[in-house]
């Protein structure tokens, strides 16, 4: 039911920050220890032998990159995000562990029991495959493809993953006050459609390994080798057919490509082989006459597949998606095989995360605002919110000044842009009103039952929005999250408490470092309101053109410059028969535009702040001017190491560029950087011709 929406737009890849790891490892003797968070500005992280005008990322981060290899349980390790995430997760673990042992409130008992059930590996092992047997029993009884929709609703009603497609309720992108039914493509287990349809040596190898993985999983579940091979082949055939008709991530970034309003009658006519009436009437959603079919071609193809694929193939497909979807919560044999392929093979991760880490993350995902209430009380001081309010106001002023000064934009469009900026809502720290999880029944000895209860709660919470006014105070992240996001349909920016601390935000450092850290994050999120996606939504959050045709043309010319520039950046090198992996400038365009704009407007805000204090951008601290400290502080946010496998996957699925290019790509488009470091025009970080949107 998790919709394949590319909004809200996150500072990092949504949901998992950097490490995309399984949910819980079955065996773990490690003891939690509090991680050391880095300073906001660290001279020891720098490689002073590097030329900042040639490779600023190496100059600002080189020593850190050299001295901080990727931990065995991670696929990407970042100086700021990863270490702060680990610190927040340690604090979260302290809260959960205490609640599991001695809960003081009903809320603590609920999330304490959820965490305890996850940590109870003995019970998980004892149950083995039993928790998914009821779902498999329903699948085995499926008489024909005509009854598929009824079966899907049964599986969803008990919280079991089933693949196929994604259905739920979200804002109407052309009337953001309304919430409508939406249906999206889905059904794939591999990270992206390219894994199924691109005929490169690398993808052919991955497909072969994926088939072997499925065979092993089916064998563990009781199939003979022959049965497992037949089932694995059937799943591969169906998923490949779905991949061939799936819309690309790049195309789905543009809202007009995913907005197709159908009457329910017309949708049923388009897909007559699928009994939507049964599905919609048995999953517990209210009445609706129209819906947004985000990917019509996918559903036309699915209709044909339902008619042509044998019923046994559909049974194998559904058995697989239940098994794959729950493998991380099953006994050790299933967990290990799942990790071996999706963690080790696909991403280069050497070992699973510690059990306590994964159970902390799982509990936060399932009961985030329950856990978050107590987390905020312990870890988010009121003065942090007050300081953020001031920083946000400073950045809003700078973006307004930037809009006024743009030479390529007409006065008519500037007025509309300023109006949209004035309407942005800021959410800082945590929700004003917490969710009520009292209907989620948690059992201390039933991990999968708890995940099912959470899934049903989230689905029903979403379905209840149908036809109701939008709740503008709702959050899309939990308080401990180290991330931030902008929502075009809400026209709001959201900064969870988790990111509002060192090294991003530090009361004790000079303004240059804070503006280079959290200031650029704020500017980044604001700029999303005016990137190639956000600029298509007005101040109310409606999908509506507010630029003149001439200004839209000028805007597109500038964003095309950025896309072409980032197309040339390397994500992973060539070796053997594996080709070089370049970034996708169109996929990453929104994030790159926001990085560039955020760097510029945060610098403008710093200049205003220093001037108001009677200080100069050229004053030195520890041998560096405030301008230089600003850029170094910004760069050190993005110091990172990443496995090659993860880097290649990210280049296909992640709209964010790697840290190196978030730094070098941004500074080379900002003349103030070249001047701050005395670069000569024509050097790599101070080119004669550069790209600028905002």
Question: What residue ranges belong to the model's regions?
Answer:
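Noncatalytic, helix-rich "gating/capping" subdomain that lines the substrate-entry/channel surface
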Residues: 97-394
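Boundary at the C-terminal end of the N-terminal hydrophobic targeting segment
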Residues: 17-19, 23-27
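Bacterial N-terminal signal peptides that target proteins for export
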Residues: 1-7
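Short, Gly/Pro- and small/polar-rich lid/capping loops
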Residues: 28-44
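Active-site-surrounding "flap" and adjacent substrate/cofactor-binding loops of secreted or lumenal enzymes
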Residues: 32-35, 50-126
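Intrinsically disordered, low-complexity linker/terminal regions across diverse proteins
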Residues: 32-34, 235, 265, 269-274, ...
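Bacterial N-terminal signal peptides
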Residues: 7-16
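Hydrophobic/aromatic-rich, well-ordered segments within soluble, folded domains that form packed cores
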Residues: 46-66, 196, 200-219, 589, ...
